[in-house]
Amino acid sequence: MSYVYFRLPHSTHVFRNRLSTEPEEIASLAELNGRRGFVIAPFTTSDDCPILLLPTDWEEVNLNFSGDNQNGEQTHLSSNDGVSAMLLDADYEKERQRYAVDFHNYHGQLTNDAFQKIVLARSARLTATEKLSPLTLFARACHRYPRMFVALFSTERSGTWLIATPETLISGTDGAMQTMALAGTMRLSGANLDFDVEGGSIGKDDIHWSTKNIKEQRYVETYITECVEQFSDDVNVEGPFTVRAGDLVHLRSDIRFHLKDTAHLGNLINALHPTPAVCGMPKDATRDFIINNESGERNYYSGFSGLLDPNGDTRLFVTLRCMQIEGEGEATAYRLYAGGGLLKDSQCQAEWEETEAKMNTMRQLFKHI
């Protein structure tokens, strides 16, 4: 049975939809104009990774609910089952070698001025010493990451994915919309672990952003603002400021605007996605390069998901911190994804460490709370 669970940022309400049929497949983002539903979109649409549109037949569930459903299937939605697991990565050295080759290839394009910025992604396929159900991992993500959009979905076409992401693609109600330019990454440590306010002052004086991070975020902000201005005459940019996502912080600008015509919401989404935060600049050239040169397939990583309603509430989020859950029982594996924006002055070791830090968002879920 296909299903989706989700919880919005800064909310305690969890909703689910268990589908009796497979979701509708959409050929292009522009075809989302005038449509309503829960959208699951890949980095780039293909026969293997279509855009999926699910109906909005939601029921609210208790995060601590545990039991059997009416079909006798076990339904477990508790974050406190007392189980911790060690994650094993048998291919770690091979992954590092592949990443180094990709980095050299990507960085060469930057030094030759082919691109201003490009995002290099990788994945790691892990096994665990204990098996944790997708619902347990979802519940733990809700508990650990209250600021993030958390979703768990499973369909025949997409497979099973768990997402905990800090980045909004677009949100709003009745045409009053907001998006964000999120880029730049630093790991919190020491006293900075107390940093707990979006745009606030706790630890602010101790968080110093490098020129590379500031430049990367500015690229993203400029691109997204220019996209939005095609669909709105009223655009307001606030930021950048520092926000927390797990044990990481990012630079973020908020971009608020009024959509001229809500019937063209799909066109706006098509213009925004993929943003420079997951792709690069210029958009089309870097996307084509990624598709043809990246060692692994991104699939639904760096796509987006969430609620779509042109005449109501829209809440779409970029699929950043995520894992794909493959197989069942003893054969279960967890494929974690992460990426980072490369500029001319990027260094391979630092970028590898950034992807490791981002993957820790998912790794932490295997530890008992």
Q: Language model features by range: what are they?
A:
Residues 107-123:
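Charged, compositionally biased non-catalytic regions
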Residues 113, 170, 222:
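Conserved hydrophobic/aromatic pocket- or pore-lining residues that grip, position, or stack substrates
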Residues 1-99, 133-137, 151-169, 175, ...:
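Cofactor- and metal-binding active-site motifs of prokaryotic enzymes
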Residues 40, 118, 150-154, 298-306:
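A short glycine-rich, hydrophobically flanked beta-strand micro-motif that places a catalytic Asp/Glu
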Residues 61-97, 102-104, 126-127, 180, ...:
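Contiguous alpha-helical scaffold segments within structured protein domains
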Residues 119-124, 154, 240-242:
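Short, surface-exposed recognition loops or helix-turn segments adjacent to catalytic cores
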Residues 255-369:
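Conserved hydrophobic core element of enzyme catalytic domains
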Residues 2-11, 127-215, 219, 312-339:
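An anion-binding catalytic pocket shared by soluble metabolic enzymes
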